[in-house]
A protein has these predicted regions:
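A short C-terminal helix-loop "cap" of Rossmann-like NAD(P)-dependent dehydrogenase/epimerase domains
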Residues: 32-42, 94-109
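Conserved catalytic-core motifs of eukaryotic protein kinase domains, centered on the activation segment
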Residues: 22-24, 89-94, 151-153
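C-terminal helical subdomain
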Residues: 50-51, 56-59, 78, 100-131, ...
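Rossmann-like NAD(H)/NADP(H) cofactor-binding core
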Residues: 11, 77, 138
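Catalytic loop of short-chain dehydrogenase/reductase
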Residues: 4-72, 83
Length: 155
């Protein structure tokens, strides 16, 4: 339907963890669509590696397909949320094992607070609207400045 109307917008969800992936072989398998090999490799690496790798694959797929989609009238972007307060993250923050580490992590967010669902929703709403018509093929970090702090020379 988007292609038929030649006037669509797509927003993918990546993560600010995507640049931290240290398993390019896993990302390459995901991008190649080799699900059995990717699943087999995922069984041998850490959960963080599979998470960041899958999010990196989303961002790379988007960038590789941006020109073709834009030529067909489809704008595509991705958001890369950082730590966001949700019922799931609240449970981890209150966990006796992980709680202290989460509190330390949260104190390192440059803007001084974790993300809220509405922070993500506001950006998605903007990207889906007319005021973002020239933004295409971008990964926008919504992480309170964490990515800029951790990777100041990478963009």
């Amino acid at each position: 339907d988007l292609l038929a109307s030649r006037n669509g917008r797509v927003v993918l969800i990546s993560s600010n963890s995507a640049p931290m992936c240290d398993r390019p072989d896993y990302v390459d398998l995901l991008l190649a669509g080799d699900e059995p090999a990717a699943a087999a490799l995922a069984d041998t690496i850490t959960g963080q590696q599979t998470y960041s790798g899958s999010k990196q694959a989303i961002a790379r797929w988007m960038r590789r397909n941006t020109a073709d989609l834009a030529a067909q009238g489809i704008s595509i972007n991705a958001i890369a949320p950082g730590y966001t307060e949700t019922p799931m993250t609240a449970a981890v923050a209150n966990d006796p094992i992980y709680g202290d580490a989460i509190k330390k992590f949260l104190s390192s967010i440059p803007v001084g607070r974790p993300g809220r669902p509405e922070d993500m929703a506001d950006l998605v709403e903007f990207l889906l609207g007319e005021k973002s018509s020239f933004i295409c093929g971008s990964v926008l970090f919504v992480d309170g400045g964490h990515d800029a702090m951790l990777r100041p020379d990478a963009f």
